[in-house]
Amino acid sequence: QNDGDCPIAVSNVKLTIAAAGASETAEFVPELSDYIVLLPGETGYIARWLGETTIPAGEAITLNASLTAEKRDERGARITVDNLYIADNYPSVTTLSGRLTCQEGRACAANMIFAGFYDENGRFIGAWYFSKNALFEGGDSKNFVVDMNDFPIAKLSEKAADVRGIGFGFDF
């Protein structure tokens, strides 16, 4: 969450994951981070697939995240993400559906959409991001359905009591 008083973009992320005596570190710049500008009070999400790991499967992990943020001018269009619904489909594909609405008076040809998943206690359990191939004029709304292939949380619809989204529209 941007608890400051100016727009920011996350310019670097360092994750340290530890469990069962093993630990791994991943450092990266989030995709399209120059366009993902959080206004004061906004909450954003970062998702990263780490691939092969030395952390034993099924172990409880400890995650330490260090973020570097830089002041940015607000850019692009805000995209409201609402009417979110998760479905676990046969045989094992989870889908996320909802509606995207572009900010009045702004247009965009590209976008990044983020969703955060929370359990019944309001505890954050994971995030997903995607880009929807859609041109928006100011005020346009478009429905979407995306397959969440390889999402690591099985039966997400049973575990996520709340889904929150945020979207960013921009032109290259």
PLM regions with names:
Residues 44, 94-96, 111, 142:
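Hydrophobic core residues within well-ordered beta-strands of beta-rich domains
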Residues 51-93, 151-172:
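Terminal connector regions
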Residues 1-7, 100-105:
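Asparagine-centered strand-capping/turn motif at beta-strand->loop junctions
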Residues 7-14, 26-28, 107-114, 126-128:
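Short, hydrophobic/aromatic beta-strand segments
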Residues 101-116, 121:
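Mature extracytoplasmic domains of secretory-pathway proteins
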Residues 25-55, 125-153:
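Intrinsically disordered, low-complexity Pro/Gly/Ser/Thr-rich segments with frequent PxxP/GP/PP motifs
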